[in-house]
Regions:
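N-terminal strand-loop-strand
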Residues: 1-23
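Short, well-ordered beta-strand micro-motif
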Residues: 10-12, 77-79, 192
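Active-site segment of metal-dependent pyrophosphate-handling enzymes
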Residues: 36-40, 44-90, 102-103, 123-132, ...
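NUDIX/MutT-family hydrolases
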Residues: 77, 87-121, 135-143, 161-174, ...
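Short helix-coil junctions and helix-kink-helix linkers
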Residues: 147-156
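Long, intrinsically disordered, low-complexity Ser/Thr/Pro-rich regulatory/activation regions
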Residues: 178-212
């Protein structure tokens, strides 16, 4: 993510097909590595990025999706704080940049379809599973959590009901420490995550559908 919302990491291809066009990072799996290891390697090689959260998304296999030959792609999506990384393009990537999901350039292959499916999956999951929390600082304001959900959902939420539900889950802990006051007003309350409750909810899930 970035400050202004969800962004997608893209690389500019420096080989055919689709030379000089933007695409998702990716490549072929080596004989001695798992699919997840291939994802991690390609991200490191093409953009200098390591991943916090990795999930298999979908398998794309239309016969005409790659002009070279029949290629079946197993796609993954992950979440990182873009501010934590200085992108470094290498191997077959001429450049690597973050693009807001509402301002995407034309994409090579069927990568626009892959991005759309990833966004839809993410927005469906966050109402029943605590994903994305690793994008916040270790200590955070509740408004930071609200902003995270609104960025991921792409819309406003019912803040009062959202806070009541989140607090009832026991997922976050109110700290004695207060946030520094940057403007006139009272210092904001700081929170942290209950790591054990977080692990439990990752397994059992919850339902925020009616509150968002």
């Amino acid at each position: 993510t970035q400050e202004n919302g969800i962004s997608v990491l893209l690389i500019k291809r420096k080989i055919e097909p689709f030379i000089n066009e933007w695409a998702l990072p990716g490549g072929f799996v080596l004989n001695d590595e798992t699919l997840e290891e291939a994802v991690e390697r390609e991200l490191k090689e093409e953009a200098g990025v390591s991943i916090n959260y990795l999930e298999q998304l979908f398998t794309f296999g239309k016969p005409s999706r790659d002009p070279r030959t029949r290629v079946i792609s197993v796609s993954y999506f992950g979440m990182v704080k873009s501010s934590d990384y200085s992108l470094l393009a290498s191997t077959d990537a001429a450049a690597a940049e973050w693009f807001n999901i509402y301002e995407l350039p034309s994409l090579a292959f069927d990568h626009k379809e892959i991005v759309e499916k990833a966004i839809a999956r993410l927005r469906a999951k966050i109402v029943y599973e605590p994903i994305g929390f690793e994008l916040l600082d270790r200590k955070f304001l509740f408004s930071d959590l609200e902003q995270l959900y609104m960025k991921l959902l792409g819309r406003e939420i019912d803040r009062r009901n959202f806070k009541r539900k989140i607090m009832s889950l026991g997922l976050i802990i109110e700290l004695e420490e207060k946030a520094p006051v940057l403007t006139a007003g009272r210092p904001g309350k700081l929170y942290s995550f209950d790591s054990e409750k977080y692990k439990q909810l990752k397994v059992n899930g919850f339902d925020l559908n009616k509150l968002l």
